[in-house]
Amino acid sequence: MDKKNIDWANLGFGYVDTDKRFVANFKDGKWDDGVLTEDSNVVINECAGVLQYAQTIFEGMKAYTTEDGRIVTFRPDLNASRFADSARRLEMPVFPEDKFVEAIKETVKANAAYVPPYGSGATLYVRPYMFASSSVIGVKPAEEYQFRVLTTPVGPYFKGGAKPITIKVSDFDRADPHGTGHIKAGLNYAMSLHAIVTAHAEGFDENMYLDAATRTKVEETGGANFIFVTKDNKVVTPKSNSILPSITRRSIMYVAKEYLGLEVEEREVFIDEVKDFAECGLCGTAAVISPVGKIVNHGEEICFPSGMDEMGPITKKLYETLTGIQMGRIEAPEGWLVEIK
C-alpha cells in the first residue's frame, strides 16, 4: 500500500486527521457491532454524562512498521484488560476485550497508509476511548455509551534524541489512596493540568507526585511511571495501588530480567532514598523511556550520576532492547506483537 504524502521526518507529536475511525454504541443494555466511519466529529446531547460528570476512559498505544515491513501493534490485549478495569471502576459497560483488540486491528488496517515507514522515527498513535453519551442530570451513571478508536501519525516524542529532563516534587496530589489513580480515566489527567502548567512555568519538565496519605513515597508523574536503577544495576519501580499499571513499565521489567539478566524489584520507593539511585527514567507509550537527570525537592537538588547529557547506561539498554522488540529488530516474546494483515 502506498503511504500518504507526509513529511515523516518532521512530523510533530500532535493530532492529524486520518481516513477512518471505529465507532460502537451501547444502548438498551448491549453493544452494537460497531462500524468504521469517515466522520471525525462526535455529536452528543448537551447533558451527556461525559460533559456533566466526566464519565470517560481511554487508552494509548501505537502501531509500528517493523524492519521487515510488517505493521504491528504492541500488546493490545493488555490495553483491552486495563480498559475493562477502568470501565468497571467508573460504572461503565465493559467493551468485550476480544472485540477491543479486533477494533484496534480493524482501525489500524483501515489507516495503514498513515503508518509511518520503518526508520522514520514516527509511529501511528492509537487512541481507544469510551464516554457516557446519554443525558444525565442527577449524579449517576449514564444509560448509553459510545466506544471509539481514532488514530493519528506522530513523530518521535523527543526530537534529536532523548535528553535527560528536570522534574520537581509536586505539592499537589495526583490520586487518593482509594481513588482512581489505578485506572486511565480522563478526570485523572484533567486534575494534573494545573500542576503541570505550574511546573512548566517554574522551568521544570514534569512533576513527581508522592503518595497522598504520607507524602513520603514516590508514585508517578501526570502521565508516566518511574523506573530507577541502583548503583549495582538493579531495576526498581514503585509499587502502589494508586499508580496506573503501565504496560510499558511491565514490559521494561520483563526485558530487564529476561533479556538483560538484571535483578528487578517492584516495591515502595521512599523519596528519601531517591538520591541513592544511579539512574532514573519515566516510562510510557509516548516516549517509551524519558531519562531524568535531576529532581528538585523544595530546593534540594538530586542529581543522578548518569548526568544531564544522555541516558544512563542501563536505561539506554532497556530503551534500545524494548524499541528493538517493537520494531522487529529483536525477537519478541510470544504474543507481544500483533500483526495487522
Outline where the language-model segments fall:
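Helix-start/capping segments and mature chain N-termini
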Residues: 1-107, 129, 136-341
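Charged, gly/pro-rich active-site loop segments
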Residues: 98, 107-121
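Extended, Lys/Arg-enriched charged tracts that mediate electrostatic binding to polyanionic substrates
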Residues: 117-127, 131
